[in-house]
Amino acid sequence: MKRKRLTELFPFLLPLRQKQRKFLFYLKMKFDKAIYSHTKEEGLLPHLIFETHSLLINPNTGYDIRYQYNKVHNLKLAVKTMDHILIRPGETFSFWQLARYADRKERYKDGLCLVHGEIQGVYGGGLCQLSNLLYWLFQHTPLTVVEHHNHAKHSFPVPESGVPSWVDATVSEGWLDLKVKNETNATFQLDFSFDEDNLYGCILADRPVPLLEDMPDGPDQK
């Protein structure tokens, strides 16, 4: 029989545990000697490396559709923190370094999230759609992935979009991050936009970047 977590036995301890994990999570980054990307530039860099899109509303989850609209709200808050961000030589992009205070002015809503193997509506749920898109963008650059995590299991069918369904990069504040380091001489930049149906993302650079010879084309390649 699988041993239960302490927070499963005593749910009232969960908020305290989450605060503890987040504190240690960011404390570790403060002293890890990485130079994290925080600079934005209003204008776009001249060289487009790759662009893609992700369908916002998934009607096939089997759960209340309101969670999909809540997810879109959450995505827009998180995207604001990293839109037009520069990833300069020697810098490391961290999803949570940027999105840490995304809900400071406007609160997240409950979105779907995989928790202990079960789909639940949780505060800020749905941000993995953004981390998936980011990971797919990064896969088309020479940026070095230094932290990446897959979901423990896939939860529901994913509709066709510009991001292949096998692309998987989960994030969870205090536990799991998505990080890439720029070990090149080029500066990269992220750009995002929304329309009614899609989240669009692209990555640009300040100079031409050679296309990667070995591109991932299936779930067994990272």
Pin down the residues of each PLM region.
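Well-ordered beta-sheet/strand-loop patches within structured domains
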Residues: 2-222
